[in-house]
């Protein structure tokens, strides 16, 4: 079982006191959506909330500063949906904590990438170079795979890339020093490390720009972020309305205007072809 950290967001702290209130006790036209701070909160505020409000919904966005509390809040009824994670993380977290949560729809996703405040090129790597990376298993695997692709390390042959860990590093080719940190702390680590892997949401929330990255992953479907809901809510009308909002032309326009460089889900790529 994961330990539940305190929420830093004042709004989230206040809202967490109502975790015992089941979602079905609320007006079904009042939706509470949890997100990580940064672009996924902005996607809801700028794109999804206006669409749903035109349909008569009241939408409240609760921002979290960690990857743990949003799923507990969703399972316990404090949230109706959340948007911050990919399917690998959702599946593992739900299994480990016996939560009945399901994917609703993929969302535009910012890639994990390598940033540096001390170096302008990856070619400056040398023996003893410090590299910070996420300490959670799924995102650490993404970082290790990219390091393998860059030729800085070598992973064990035939390793499942979504399960790669430090134990699978067979050769530290550049003799770098890996420093696992909580994902939210990685932007700050840039002051003290040579290079840091930073998840897209935390990068943008901290003021980093995607085009400043020295290397970016190519996002696969496994790492495309998603909207999660309680499995029991799958057939409810508001769920269909929420999904339709993400699939809309209006949200595609918001994505193109405000989230350039994000990897678009298949439905947005298909819609883009039809509207051109």
Predicted features by range, described:
Residues 111-122, 224-238:
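A bilobed periplasmic-binding-protein/Venus flytrap-type ligand-binding module shared by bacterial periplasmic
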Residues 38-60:
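Short, polar/charged alpha-helical segment
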Residues 63-67, 77-78, 82-91, 108, ...:
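Beta->alpha turn/N-cap motifs
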Residues 92-104, 118-119, 190-192, 197, ...:
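Ligand-binding "clamshell"
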Residues 61-72, 159-188:
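Short helix-initiation/N-cap motifs at beta->coil->alpha
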Residues 27-38, 57-63, 130-131:
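Short, well-ordered beta-strand elements
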